[in-house]
Design a protein with these regions (language model features):
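Exposed, interaction-prone assembly regions rather than primary DNA-binding/catalytic cores
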Residues: 125-139
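N-terminal leader segment of winged-helix/HTH proteins
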Residues: 1-28, 74
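Hydrophobic structural patches
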Residues: 10, 38-41, 131
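Alpha-helical DNA-recognition elements
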Residues: 23, 70, 133
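Charged, amphipathic alpha-helical coiled-coil/dimerization segments
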Residues: 18, 69-129
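N-terminal helix-turn-helix DNA-binding core of bacterial DNA-binding proteins
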Residues: 19-60
Length: 139
């Protein structure tokens, strides 16, 4: 591969990861963004507010509304208005989505293992540190 600037490489890595993840998830009728919502909800005990999902994904309100709406139509999520604060919409995993959790976690681990296969543990640790620095520079 010809020498490219770092931003270009990061973008291309992201694009390739998204294509691979979307292909892996197609049989589950999920996209990468939707799988991230499922993983987040799982980490929060199965439910969270729509606003919490927006903050976690770092995307706009309309983007989250679209993602959640499609997932609800596909039977992955249930949604309702929070009785204690009507401004909040609560989003929860369905039993169908909960059952997919273990398989999705295994796919994530397999993809990460493939991605980092030629790196040592020290290289991986250093890479994480450097990526966090770059990420924080953009804040």
């Amino acid at each position: 591969m010809p020498q490219k600037d770092i931003g270009y490489l990061i973008k291309n890595i992201n694009d390739k990861l998204k294509v691979k993840a979307d292909a892996d998830l197609k049989h589950s009728n999920l996209t990468l963004a939707q799988s991230r919502v499922l993983a987040f909800l799982d980490s929060k005990g199965g439910q969270a507010t729509q606003k919490e999902i927006e903050v976690y994904l770092e995307v706009s309100h309309p983007t989250v509304v679209g993602i959640i709406s499609r997932m609800e139509q596909n039977g992955h999520l249930r949604c309702w208005v929070d009785e204690t604060d009507k401004r909040n919409k609560v989003v929860a995993l369905t039993e169908q989505a909960k059952a997919m959790g273990e398989e999705m976690e295994q796919r994530i681990l397999a993809n990460e293992k493939m991605l980092l296969a030629s790196l040592s543990e020290a290289d991986i640790k250093k890479l994480k540190q450097m990526l966090l620095i770059i990420y924080n520079n953009l804040e």
